[in-house]
Amino acid sequence: MAFLDNPTIILAHIRQSHVTSDDTGMCEMVLIDHDVDLEKFNPSSTYGDSASETQGSNGETQGYVYSQSVDITSSWDFGIRRRSNTAQRLERLRKERQNQIKCKNVQWKDRNTSYSAEELSSLFEKKNFRVRSPCSGKQSILSVRLEQCPLQLNNPFNEYSKFDGKGHVGTTATKKIDVYLPLHANQDKLQPMTVVTIANAKVHDLIGLICWQYTSEGREPKLNDNVSAYCLHIAEDDGEVDTDFPPLDSNEPIHKFGFSTLALVEKYSSPGLAAKQSLFVRINAAHGFSLIQVDSMKVTMKDILQKALKRRKGSQRGSGPQYRLEKQSEPNVPVDLDCTLESQSTLEFCLVRENSSRGEEISEEDPQIDIATVQDMLSSHHYKSFKVSMIHRLRFTTDVQLGISGDKVEIDPVTNQKASTKFWIKQKPISIDSELLCACDLVEEKSPSHAIFKLTYLSNHDYKHLYFESDAATVNEIVLKVNYILESRASTARAEYFAQKQRKLNRRTSFSFQKEKKSGQQ
């Protein structure tokens, strides 16, 4: 053991002792004292004479020189040491193995046969690259493809190609639609063109995509460069355009409509053609009526009958019961199917089954339908939302948004952050298909600011009723809109609902009649 009073030597001894034992390097960070190092270069000025000052300075400087370890540096790079020989050797072996994988060893073998000088020269023939061979005139694959598809370069609808969903199937929501093109008037049977579009595209974008694909495939006749000249209509599976409904709104997203078959129709701006589009023929039947749109008064009654039978659910051409047309004002007088509509002097007819007759009480008193009523009926299938209050049991109400379209009725709760929902019923969203709707009736109308209506629909083989309240104007508009939709559709659920309602009424009437009969006998 040695007694030392020089802190510099003690610090150097501690540093050198921990070099080989401290793997973390923490001792180097803890024992680095910058204040001690500064005192070596700035000795105190309290020494008496210069000799002692010089001697002390030399001694401290010498102690500072020997106090620093070779492996320790007073910097932020402490703890960094050189790699060991084993690690360097392993790294070198790893690189050699990687280089051996890239190299291929070929074993030299003496040839068994002798080759002539000409054969040896042909193996490694010297080529003169300065002399270029004449161009053979062979076109590249890109040039051939550009010549085969000249229309793609001059396609005026290229801006709508970004809505093509064929390259996004599986990654983005897409929608596959069969589009009929009635522009081919000379073809007997139309073939649809399958278009795949992204789901967030609008109807206007879909029209542009259809025109782009039509032009890219080189179809004839050529289309108008203006996309606004076309519109999309609902079409049947055989390609017949359903003109009873207006075209799809060009500003609405395509995923809002559930139709898988559409038709691209050119708009008509001529006043004469516009008048033709407003020409409707009313066909009365046993359970409602249908509106058949015709192009002109020159159409034959046979065509009108075929359209009416096709509109009627379950009636197919060549099978099932046969029907005839009669004027609404002339019962039991069949109409000549070879005559034109212009010769009938009326736009209202009645569809009657063969070997049957309609009673005299059938509605000769029905008012003539005007064009305003037709427009209201056609616009009833457009989507529109209303803010109403849904009535629960115990007269609790919940604010909901009632969305009505020709396909379904949606009931979405309106979130109100200010109102406390602790003691109130939490309404869930409800979606009702139009095929399941049965009735929409006005329950009460107490004042212009308060009215209640009832919506009846089929759910799990049971009829459910929903009650709503709002102002009288909104309620009347909702009831009229829903009833227009119900009248234009041949719903099985609605027919069963009214049949069941009639049976209950008959049983009630029969029971009351028997009760009165027994009381009279007594």
From Swiss-Prot:
Which top-rank group of organisms is this from? Eukaryota
> For the SIN1-type PH domain, which residue ranges apply?
382-487
Its subcellular locations are: Cell membrane; Endoplasmic reticulum membrane; Early endosome membrane; Late endosome membrane
Keyword Cytoplasm attributed: yes
Domain CRIM, first and last residues per copy: 139-267
Q: How is its activity regulated?
A: Phosphatidylinositol 3,4,5-trisphosphate (PI(3,4,5)P3) promotes MTOR activation by relieving MAPKAP1/SIN1-mediated inhibition of MTOR that takes place in absence of PI(3,4,5)P3.
Membrane topology recorded in Swiss-Prot or TrEMBL: Peripheral membrane protein
- UniProt keyword list: Cell membrane, Cytoplasm, Endoplasmic reticulum, Endosome, Golgi apparatus, Lysosome, Membrane, Mitochondrion, Mitochondrion outer membrane, Nucleus
Show the stretches that span the lipid bilayer.
none
Recorded GO cellular component terms are:
cilium; cytoplasm; cytosol; early endosome; early endosome membrane; endoplasmic reticulum; endoplasmic reticulum membrane; Golgi membrane
Q: GO molecular function of the protein, one example?
A: phosphatidylinositol-3,4-bisphosphate binding
Biological process (GO), any one: TORC2 signaling
Q: Where is this region: Disordered?
A: 43-62, 310-330
Binding positions for a 1,2-diacyl-sn-glycero-3-phospho-(1D-myo-inositol-3,4,5-trisphosphate)? 393, 428, 464
Q: Where are the residues of the annotated region SIN1-type RBD? A: 279-353
- Domain remark in the UniProt entry: The CRIM domain forms a ubiquitin-like fold with a characteristic acidic loop, which recognizes and binds AGC protein kinase family members substrates.
By sequence similarity, the record places it as follows: Belongs to the SIN1 family.
- Relate the assembly described in the record: Component of the mechanistic target of rapamycin complex 2 (mTORC2), consisting in two heterotretramers composed of MTOR, MLST8, RICTOR and MAPKAP1/SIN1. Contrary to mTORC1, mTORC2 does not bind to and is not sensitive to FKBP12-rapamycin.
- Write out the function statement from the record: Component of the mechanistic target of rapamycin complex 2 (mTORC2), which transduces signals from growth factors to pathways involved in proliferation, cytoskeletal organization, lipogenesis and anabolic output. In response to growth factors, mTORC2 phosphorylates and activates AGC protein kinase family members, including AKT (AKT1, AKT2 and AKT3), PKC (PRKCA, PRKCB and PRKCE) and SGK1. In contrast to mTORC1, mTORC2 is nutrient-insensitive.
Q: What is this protein called?
A: Target of rapamycin complex 2 subunit MAPKAP1
Q: What species is given as this protein's source?
A: Gallus gallus
Record gene name: MAPKAP1
